[in-house]
């Protein structure tokens, strides 16, 4: 009898991970126990994924606002510092802004509008149209912004982020000036020392600032790249991918995620006798169709993964085969024809640009699988920071 299930994704309940725990040992033992208790046989191509937050927690990869401030002072001189294009998020940016402000005498905050990089809106496009404001040309002061739009409250959080970020800066002991523009160089009339806080466009922002004459250009990925007074750190991503741990600390993106994934994959493969892949995942790369927010506030979906997860899908479009190429067939004859077509597919030859693959998804496997994991585990109280996936690499012919 042929298999009736394809890809199966399971959230695995795990114990609470604590600083100093072995994320590899706990992940592997938890998954093996779940497979045994539920009579699930491991198969070649299975994937074990663990969320980045528990990896960082086990590593003790944290930093305080004062440690951030110390790094800011050392790298900027601590006078007037520009903070360009942060996202609007209490979880992701409020403590980073406090740390930066603690390390400076004045902060010039440049906010993009009508929304931040990931789609959190200050105002709507319709409001811009009504006010006659061109977001690609017009640079607004706080007074001009308030005159045009008044108080702006985020529809989901109920927070006026303009007022909130201004209060954070001032409560940290720095002067605050807020400017609204979509050209990062608009901050240079105010200061030549800039921390650009965008995530996915940060390299371009750094290049534009440097070319326009900024003297000090940093990104969030240039802060906390090494320990500061005993802090955690991330040599590659710095403060990118961090989020609020408590009222004075952020949890940084995990270090050595590739080594963690490889250790989990090897231990699972050794224990099961099957080829098991592994990854460390963070934010999924999906966009909320209602709120218009792109959920990827981490620098990457998956900071670490095993080699079997490199690449993109190389699939045929079954609908095209059934409706076009084999339109005159039906029943078992159609099934056999499609199966033979799939079996004849050269796995090493890309199908990009070929009609039979049109409508499939030419995205990185790690982005697809990591997004699937993030949607499965959620960000609340499910208690499933480990995801076990079976059948992801199967096709219609696999029994």
Where are each of the predicted segments found?
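Conserved mixed alpha/beta catalytic, RNA-binding, or beta-rich assembly cores of soluble enzyme
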Residues: 2-44, 53-399
């Amino acid at each position: 009898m042929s298999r009736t299930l394809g890809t199966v994704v399971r959230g695995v309940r795990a114990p609470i991970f604590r600083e100093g725990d072995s994320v590899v040992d706990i992940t592997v033992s938890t998954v093996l126990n779940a497979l045994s208790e539920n009579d699930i046989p491991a198969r070649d191509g299975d994937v074990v994924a663990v969320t980045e937050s528990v990896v960082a927690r086990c590593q003790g990869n944290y930093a305080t606002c004062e440690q951030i401030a110390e790094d800011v002072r050392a790298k900027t001189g601590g006078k007037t510092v520009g903070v360009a294009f942060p996202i609007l998020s209490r979880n992701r940016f409020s403590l980073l802004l406090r740390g930066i402000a603690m390390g400076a005498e004045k902060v010039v905050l440049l906010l993009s509008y009508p929304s931040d990089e990931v789609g959190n809106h200050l105002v709507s496009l319709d409001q811009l149209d009504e006010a006659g404001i061109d977001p690609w040309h017009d640079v607004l002061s706080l007074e001009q912004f308030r005159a045009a739009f008044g108080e702006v409250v985020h529809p989901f959080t109920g927070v006026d982020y303009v007022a909130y970020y201004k209060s954070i800066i001032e409560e940290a002991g720095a002067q605050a000036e807020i400017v609204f523009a979509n050209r990062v160089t608009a901050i240079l009339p105010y200061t030549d020392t800039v921390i650009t806080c965008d995530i996915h466009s940060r390299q371009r922002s750094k290049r534009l600032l440097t070319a326009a004459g900024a003297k000090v250009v940093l990104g969030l990925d240039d802060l906390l790249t090494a320990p500061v007074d005993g802090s955690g750190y991330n040599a590659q991503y710095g403060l990118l991918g961090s989020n609020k741990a408590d009222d004075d600390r952020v949890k940084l993106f995990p270090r050595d995620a590739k080594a963690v994934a490889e250790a989990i994959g090897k231990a699972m493969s050794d224990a099961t006798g099957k080829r098991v892949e592994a990854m460390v995942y963070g934010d999924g790369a999906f966009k909320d169709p209602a709120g218009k927010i792109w959920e990827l506030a981490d620098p990457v979906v998956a900071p670490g993964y095993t080699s079997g997860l490199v690449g993109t899908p190389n699939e045929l479009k079954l609908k095209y085969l059934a409706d076009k190429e084999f339109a005159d067939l039906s029943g078992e004859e159609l099934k056999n024809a499609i199966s033979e077509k799939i079996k004849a597919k050269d796995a090493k030859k890309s199908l990009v640009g070929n009609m039979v693959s049109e409508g499939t998804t030419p995205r990185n496997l790690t982005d697809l699988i990591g997004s699937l994991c993030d949607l499965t585990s959620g960000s609340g109280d499910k208690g499933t920071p480990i995801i076990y996936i079976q059948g992801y690499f199967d096709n219609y012919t696999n029994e």
